[in-house]
C-alpha cells in the first residue's frame, strides 16, 4: 500500500474489527454503497488504540507540515467525544514534549442550567485554536453546527480531522447523479475556509483492501467509485 504505514494499519484494523464492512448499505443520500464505515464500532480496547493512533499520527503529520496549529482538540457530541479524548491522550503519549499540555473539550446536545452550566465540557474555548475531530463528513451540516458553537464560545476553528473521506460527489438537487459535483469534504472546506484532513480516503481503501476483502467486494467498490467519485 502506497499510503503511510499508519493508514495501512488503521485500514487493516477497521476491516478485521468489522468497523469497515462490505456488502450493501443504504446511505442517507439513498445511494446503495458496497461499503460502510462506522466509527461508533471502535468500542473495543484494541480497536480504540488503533483509531486513536491513526488520528494522532494524522494530526502530527498535518502539524509538522505547517498546515495545522491548535491548542484544543474538540469532539462534537456524540461520536466525536471518545475520538477527541482518545486522540488527545495518544498525542501526549507519542510526543509528550509537543502535545503534553494539549487540552480537549466537547459540547452538550442540550445546555446544562445547573452546576458548571453551559454547552461546553472541558477546556474553555475562548481565544484558543480549536481542532475538530469527528468520524466522517456527509453533508457538512454537523460540522457547521460545531463550528458555530465553537465560535459562539470565542474559539477559532483551526482545522478538522475525520477518519474517512468517501470522495463521492454530493447528491444533485434534481437527483441526477450523472452530473459532476464536489465532495462533501471539499465543499465544506471551501465554504468554511477551514482545512480538513482525513486519515483514509476511498482511494486508500480500494488500494489497501486487496487481500483483506473478497475480489467481488473490491470490484463493487471500484464500480461505486467510478459512478460517484467527486470531480473536485
UniProtKB/Swiss-Prot annotation:
Pathway as given in its UniProt record: Pyrimidine metabolism; UMP biosynthesis via de novo pathway; UMP from orotate: step 1/2
InterPro entries (alphabetical): OPRT, Or_phspho_trans_dom, PRibTrfase_dom, PRTase-like
Coiled coil stretches, renumbered: none
Annotated residues for binding of 5-phospho-alpha-D-ribose 1-diphosphate: 28, 78-79, 108-109, 112, 114, 134-142
A GO cellular component entry from the record: cytoplasm
Catalytic activity, as annotated: orotidine 5'-phosphate + diphosphate = orotate + 5-phospho-alpha-D-ribose 1-diphosphate
Secreted among keywords: no
Spans traversing the lipid bilayer: none
Amino acids binding orotate: 36-37, 138, 166
EC number: 2.4.2.10
Enzyme class: transferase
Gene Ontology biological-process entries: 'de novo' pyrimidine nucleobase biosynthetic process; 'de novo' UMP biosynthetic process; pyrimidine ribonucleoside biosynthetic process
Keyword annotations from UniProtKB, A to Z: Glycosyltransferase, Pyrimidine biosynthesis, Transferase
Pfam families xref list: Pribosyltran (PF00156)
Gene Ontology MF terms: orotate phosphoribosyltransferase activity
Family statement: Belongs to the purine/pyrimidine phosphoribosyltransferase family. PyrE subfamily.
Role of this protein: Catalyzes the transfer of a ribosyl phosphate group from 5-phosphoribose 1-diphosphate to orotate, leading to the formation of orotidine monophosphate (OMP).
Complex and partners: Homodimer.
Classification via PANTHER family: OROTATE PHOSPHORIBOSYLTRANSFERASE 1-RELATED (PTHR46683:SF1)
Descriptive protein name: Orotate phosphoribosyltransferase
